[in-house]
């Protein structure tokens, strides 16, 4: 990893000279042990945790997202957990504003912000010089109605005519992404299919956590979810409107249990296996995303003492 010092000044009126200390990011695939390591770093450096897991933003989605229990936080403040209702659609632009406000506040108070999560876009939204188009509920609703009526094919053809590069990067069957791209084109006149270059707005140390036995860890974690009452959690959230949450209802595990409750899948055992398979697939995508970032220092076997020593070394190199 390289420690990032390039890029624009801080948001919300701050400048790089205002930054009192580093921002640390602990990233990597699901199930690798990021949350526990982040707590150790926070205790060592006087830090506070800022959540960068898009599903842990939702209230009540605790077991299935492996939200760190209060006792395991060991007194370390955790920010941006349980802040969204399950019926709210994910909004990275809103998250970016909230997270940067927390990060800048911690820096101003002399604390070390420790960003933790496996949602790669959310991590980059906080750390990098990125901006995101807004949304228009009326436009989105109209496009979603059209998607339900005619399917993704005609919408993808329209996108090809309006923004061919964007259309080429989106599978013709991915209705959700097609709708979002068309919404952005309608609101801004263009759509960027790829993210800009890596350019941090903070002094950043990024540490990646990975495991050679990740597939086994994921299977064990899913088994523990079921034993901990995950099915009951999903059933309770379903009563509270989970099915109406365009984002939350698609979360790993939650979508599979809902499928059983709605008669679209045969059994909870099938849902458990499907959750394990989907989570492993998702972890591979996460790994690929983060491995492309040359700024990340990877800890293949996350020994706490070695990890803390590496973080201290990287902070000292800023």
From Swiss-Prot:
Enzyme class: transferase
InterPro entries reported in the protein's UniProt record: Dimethylallyltransferase (IPR039657), IPT (IPR018022), P-loop_NTPase (IPR027417)
Origin: domain of life: Bacteria
One Pfam family this sequence matches: IPPT
Keywords: ATP-binding, Magnesium, Nucleotide-binding, Transferase, tRNA processing
Binding site for ATP: 28-35
GO biological process, one term: tRNA modification
Reaction equation(s) it catalyzes: adenosine(37) in tRNA + dimethylallyl diphosphate = N(6)-dimethylallyladenosine(37) in tRNA + diphosphate
Chain residue ranges for the region called Interaction with substrate tRNA: 53-56
Site (Interaction with substrate tRNA): 119, 140
Family: Belongs to the IPP transferase family.
Subunit structure as annotated in this protein's UniProt entry: Monomer.
Name recorded for this polypeptide: tRNA dimethylallyltransferase
Organism for this UniProt entry: Parafrankia sp. (strain EAN1pec)
Gene: miaA
């Amino acid at each position: 990893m390289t420690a990032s010092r390039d890029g624009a000044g801080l948001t919300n009126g701050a400048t790089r000279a205002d930054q009192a200390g580093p921002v640390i990011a602990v990233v990597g695939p699901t199930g690798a042990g990021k949350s526990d390591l982040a707590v150790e770093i926070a205790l060592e450096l006087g830090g506070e945790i800022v959540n960068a897991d898009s599903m842990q933003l939702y209230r009540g989605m605790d077991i299935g997202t492996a939200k760190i229990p209060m006792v395991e936080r060991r007194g370390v403040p955790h920010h941006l957990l349980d802040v969204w209702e399950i019926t709210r659609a994910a909004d990275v632009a809103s998250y970016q504003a909230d997270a940067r406000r927390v990060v800048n506040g911690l820096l101003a108070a002399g604390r070390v912000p420790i960003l933790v999560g496996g949602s790669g876009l959310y991590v980059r939204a906080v750390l990098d010089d990125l901006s995101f188009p807004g949304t228009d509920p009326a436009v989105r609703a109209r496009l979603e109605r059209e998607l339900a009526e005619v399917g993704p094919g005609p919408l993808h053809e329209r996108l090809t005519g309006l923004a061919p590069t964007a259309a080429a990067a989106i599978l013709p069957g991915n209705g959700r992404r097609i709708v979002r791209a068309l919404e952005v084109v309608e609101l801004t006149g263009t759509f960027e299919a790829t993210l800009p270059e890596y350019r941090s707005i903070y002094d950043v140390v990024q540490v990646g956590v990975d495991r050679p036995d990740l597939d086994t860890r994921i299977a064990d974690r899913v088994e523990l979810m079921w034993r901990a009452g995950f099915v009951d959690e999903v059933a309770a959230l379903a009563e509270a409107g989970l099915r109406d949450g365009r984002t939350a209802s698609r979360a790993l595990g939650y979508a599979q249990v809902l499928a059983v409750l709605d008669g679209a899948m045969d059994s909870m055992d099938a849902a458990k296996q499907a959750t394990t398979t989907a989570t492993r697939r998702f972890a591979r995508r996460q790994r690929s995303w983060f491995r492309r970032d040359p700024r990340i220092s990877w800890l293949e076997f996350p020994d706490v003492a070695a990890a803390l020593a590496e973080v201290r070394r990287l902070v000292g190199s800023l």
